[in-house]
A protein has these predicted regions:
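A contiguous loop/helix-start segment that scaffolds small-molecule binding in enzyme catalytic cores
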Residues: 9, 87, 166, 173-286
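Glycine-rich, flexible N-terminal cofactor/catalytic loop recognition
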Residues: 1-67
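Conserved helicase motor
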Residues: 64-72, 146-149
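Short, structured surface patches at the beginning of a domain
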Residues: 51-52, 67-80
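Glycine/small-residue-rich loop that forms an oxyanion/phosphate-binding "nest" at active or ligand-binding sites
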Residues: 75-124
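Short active-site oxyanion
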Residues: 33-39, 114-118, 166-167
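General beta-strand structural signal in soluble alpha/beta enzymes
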Residues: 41, 117-122, 169, 195
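Class I SAM-dependent methyltransferase SAM-binding "motif I" and its flanking Rossmann-like core
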Residues: 2, 105-163
Length: 286
């Protein structure tokens, strides 16, 4: 199906683009790219190539660069275009805008000024990694890129150590080995993790194991491509049934079964389903 020009209401359209395979884009996203008055991109070459692949004519339209290095200078100009009643389509270099992406300040300013901000959802490396990584997805925390320096990286990992959900990071091939070493040291060598690289591309690979095992793999291999790292939540194996029952009993004094299960699962790191089943049984036994 060829993209078609459609009538768009004035505003800012945040368009998710493929993270690897060019066909991983929605029909709606293609229609928006075919119809917007002005195209804005983190990487103009990537957007132009995507449009060429899908047969979207650029015509006389502008393709304006908006990235970390020029955002402060470009925002007033883009806000001026919105003020004129134009439609702007913004695309990340890859994936969903706002996720480790420079478009946040633009979207926030547009919304604060009263302009319509619309999402055309689609690919995301975070969600794709969670889908194939083999770690719990009921709760997760996306932390973006860790600091480059080992000391700062360890400090950040300590802050994340107690978060009751799967940790999600972006990392570069040059730093993945050092990150794994620091994560094993700070979070413990036995925590399970996954390294997901080149997602949706020809050489997609998911490496699973403990942090210690993955540290060894990274020391022996030179991993290439874009990388997402998943690390499981802190182990809850030391939570005994009696302790869990006590926590649930306290929570149930002022909460519904569902809310109590949510609160205790978040506190202990246990799977919500397991906690909910126990809470339900306790409620029925009363």
């Amino acid at each position: 199906m060829n993209p078609k020009a459609i009538k768009l209401n004035p505003g800012l359209y945040l368009v998710a683009t493929p993270i690897g395979t060019a066909r991983d884009i929605t029909l709606r996203a293609l229609d928006i790219l075919a119809s917007a008055d002005v195209l804005v991109a983190e990487d103009t070459r990537t957007l132009r190539k995507l449009m060429e692949i899908h047969g979207i004519p650029l015509g006389e339209r502008q393709v304006m660069a908006y990235h970390d290095h020029n955002g402060a200078q470009m925002r007033p100009r883009l806000m001026g275009l919105l003020e004129q009643g134009l439609t702007l389509a913004y695309a990340s270099e890859a994936g969903t805008p706002m996720i480790a992406d420079p478009g946040f300040d633009l979207a926030r300013e547009a919304r604060a000024a009263g302009y319509t901000v619309v999402a055309a959802p689609g690919p995301s490396a975070v969600v794709t990694a969670l889908t194939v990584g083999g770690l719990p997805t009921d709760r997760f925390f996306f932390a973006g890129f860790l600091p480059n320096a080992s000391g700062q990286r360890k400090t950040a990992l300590r802050r994340y150590a107690e978060i009751p959900g799967t940790l999600v990071f972006y990392e570069s091939p040059k730093r993945i080995a050092a990150m794994m070493r620091d994560a094993a040291e700070v979070l413990g060598p036995d925590r399970r993790a996954a390294i997901c690289r080149e997602l949706t591309k020809k050489f997609e690979e998911v490496l699973g194991g403990t942090l210690a095992e993955l540290t060894t793999i990274c020391a022996d291999r030179s991993l290439k491509g874009e990388i997402v790292v998943l690390i499981e939540r802190k182990s809850s194996e030391n939570i005994h049934d009696s302790d869990l029952e006590t926590l649930l009993r306290e929570a149930l004094t002022g909460m519904t079964v569902r809310d109590a299960a949510d609160a205790v699962a978040a506190r202990t790191g246990l799977a919500r389903r397991q906690v909910y089943q126990m809470a339900l049984k306790m409620e029925q036994d009363e």
